[in-house]
């Protein structure tokens, strides 16, 4: 059995913090808990984001009701989370509508929120997708209308666009920032070379470079965030905002006995995830997760909490985006912050030994 202390009084983190602390609340017990500082700079920018953010992929406007979305967002905000991420493509724009309605209804100060959206797949027309100047400007305008906001804090290019010159994309991103439609811009699913090219173009033409890459990062996907992005961070200041810390639920342990009903892998359009889980590699991963479960029990936490804390222990990660379909999941995930101080070097080494997939940079080979 897991201990009931998942959402109890949190420990203070040894993170480099200077901003206002968030307040951890336990809705289960009703009383505000000790203040906890858990904000980090997004890359080398001055933007302070909570080390955990709430994503809206699959859930908002799709898997969950609008009422549940409001409940989850309120829980997140009350627990100090200030980062909320969406995209024009999520639920064909409905995720942005739901998010915008909640912000308007709750009356939260806009200046207390960090809202991010992603542009690439807008509509079915040829001109409604990609990273052309036309779609970046029109797509972001449409997103802002759905969100009922004057600006987003970060607009992301949701994937690279080989059909558009890099200079055009960087100029368009600079334009929307100069027009007050966004504060910063970033990339998602871009390679290190593509990010470096965008930075070089920005420097060459006195434009605004990206500050962050959104990348998939979890125990079974490590190379990009642990080897490639740290080099970019040190060279040009691009940070990492990571998503899918539980590998679409694989790391949660929920699939160790097959595909449960109402899980993401059971949804229409997620046959790829089901196939992945039931594959030979998927079975090997489940065996490793059983070993990791023993470490989680030793630390007094759940497997999802261990997995999220493991992502947070990476100093190059500015924020980890969470996905949740109910309040229990969200509060459990937020409880990962309490596990972070317990991840000693020996525990991390033990986890690496079980996973057997630690990537090595050129520096590691030289030393």
Swiss-Prot record:
Annotated effect of mutating residue 20 to A: No effect on interaction with MAPRE1 and association with microtubules
Signal peptide feature range: none
PTM annotation: Phosphorylated by PRKCZ; may be regulated by incorporation in a complex composed of PRKCZ and SQSTM1.
UniProt keyword annotations, A-Z: Acetylation, Cell membrane, Cell projection, Cytoplasm, Cytoskeleton, Ion transport, Membrane, Methylation, NADP, Oxidoreductase, Phosphoprotein, Potassium, Potassium transport, Synapse, Synaptosome, Transport
Modification type Asymmetric dimethylarginine: residues: 28
Tissue specificity of this protein: Detected in brain. Detected in the middle third of the molecular layer of the dentate gyrus in hippocampus. Detected in neurons in the deep cerebellar nucleus. Detected in globus pallidus and pars reticulata of the substantia nigra. Detected in cerebellum. Detected at axon terminal plexuses of cerebellar granule cells. Detected in the juxtaparanodal region of nodes of Ranvier in cerebellum (at protein level). Detected in mesenteric arteries.
GO biological process assignments: hematopoietic progenitor cell differentiation; myoblast differentiation; neuromuscular process; regulation of potassium ion transmembrane transport; regulation of protein localization to cell surface
E.C. designation(s): 1.1.1.-
Localization per Swiss-Prot or TrEMBL: Cytoplasm; Membrane; Cell membrane; Cell projection, Axon
Catalysed reaction, written as an equation: hydroxyacetone + NADP(+) = methylglyoxal + NADPH + H(+); (E)-4-oxonon-2-en-1-ol + NADP(+) = (E)-4-oxonon-2-enal + NADPH + H(+)
A GO CC annotation given for this chain: postsynaptic density
Modified residues (N6-acetyllysine): 124
GO MF term (any one): transmembrane transporter binding
Binding site for NADP(+): 56-57, 63, 85, 158, 188-189, 214, 243-248, 254, 262, 264, 323, 325, 329, 332-333
Top-rank taxon: Eukaryota
pH dependence per the entry: Optimum pH is 7.2-7.4 for the NADPH-dependent reduction of 4-nitrobenzaldehyde.
Membrane topology: Peripheral membrane protein
Active site residues per record: 90
Gene3D superfamilies associated with the record: NADP-dependent oxidoreductase domain
Residues modified as Phosphoserine: 9, 14, 20, 31, 112
Residue positions, PTM Omega-N-methylarginine: 28
PANTHER family assigned to the protein according to its UniProt record, in alphabetical order: HYPERKINETIC, ISOFORM M, VOLTAGE-GATED POTASSIUM CHANNEL SUBUNIT BETA-2
UniProt function note: Regulatory subunit of the voltage-gated potassium (Kv) Shaker channels composed of pore-forming and potassium-conducting alpha subunits and of regulatory beta subunits. The beta-2/KCNAB2 subunit promotes potassium channel closure via a mechanism that does not involve physical obstruction of the channel pore. Promotes the inactivation of Kv1.4/KCNA4 and Kv1.5/KCNA5 alpha subunit-containing channels. Displays nicotinamide adenine dinucleotide phosphate (NADPH)-dependent aldoketoreductase activity by catalyzing the NADPH-dependent reduction of a wide range of aldehyde and ketone substrates.
Similarity remark: Belongs to the shaker potassium channel beta subunit family.
Annotated domain remarks: In contrast to KCNAB1, the shorter N-terminal domain of KCNAB2 cannot mediate closure of delayed rectifier potassium channels by physically obstructing the pore.
Name of this protein: Voltage-gated potassium channel subunit beta-2
Organism, as annotated: Rattus norvegicus
Lineage start: Eukaryota, Metazoa, Chordata, Craniata, Vertebrata
């Amino acid at each position: 059995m897991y201990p009931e202390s998942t959402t109890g009084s949190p420990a203070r983190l040894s993170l480099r913090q200077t901003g206002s602390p968030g307040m951890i609340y336990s809705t289960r017990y009703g009383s505000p808990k000790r203040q906890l500082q858990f904000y980090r700079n997004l890359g080398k920018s001055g933007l302070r984001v909570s080390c955990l953010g709430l994503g809206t992929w699959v859930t908002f406007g799709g898997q969950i009701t609008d009422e549940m979305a409001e409940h989850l967002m309120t829980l997140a905000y009350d627990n100090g989370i200030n980062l909320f991420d969406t995209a024009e493509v999520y639920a064909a724009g409905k995720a942005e509508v739901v998010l915008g309605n909640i912000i308007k209804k709750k009356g939260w100060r806009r200046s207390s929120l960090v809202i991010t959206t992603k542009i690439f797949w807008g509509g079915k027309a040829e001109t409604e997708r990609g990273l052309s100047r036309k779609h970046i400007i029109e797509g972001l305008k449409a997103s802002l209308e759905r969100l009922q906001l004057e600006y987003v804090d970060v607009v992301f290019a949701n994937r690279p666009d080989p059909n558009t010159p890099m200079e055009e994309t960087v100029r368009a991103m600079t334009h929307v920032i100069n027009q007050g439609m966004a504060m910063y811009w970033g990339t998602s699913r871009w390679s290190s070379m593509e990010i470096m090219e965008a930075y070089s173009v920005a420097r060459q033409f006195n434009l605004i470079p990206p500050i962050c890459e959104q990348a998939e990062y979890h125990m079974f996907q490590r190379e990009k965030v642990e080897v490639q992005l740290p080099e970019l961070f040190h060279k040009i200041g691009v940070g990492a905002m990571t998503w899918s810390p539980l590998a679409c639920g694989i790391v949660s342990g929920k699939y160790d006995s097959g595909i449960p009903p109402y899980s993401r892998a059971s949804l229409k359009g997620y046959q790829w995830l089901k196939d992945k889980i039931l594959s030979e590699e998927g079975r090997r991963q489940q065996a490793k997760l059983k070993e990791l479960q023993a470490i989680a029990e030793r630390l007094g936490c759940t497997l999802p909490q261990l997995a999220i804390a493991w992502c947070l222990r990476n100093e190059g990660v500015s924020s980890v985006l969470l996905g949740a379909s109910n309040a229990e999941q969200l509060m459990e995930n937020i409880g990962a912050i309490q596990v972070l101080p317990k991840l000693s070097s020996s525990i991390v080494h033990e986890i690496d030994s079980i996973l057997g997939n630690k990537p090595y940079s050129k520096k590691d080979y030289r030393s």
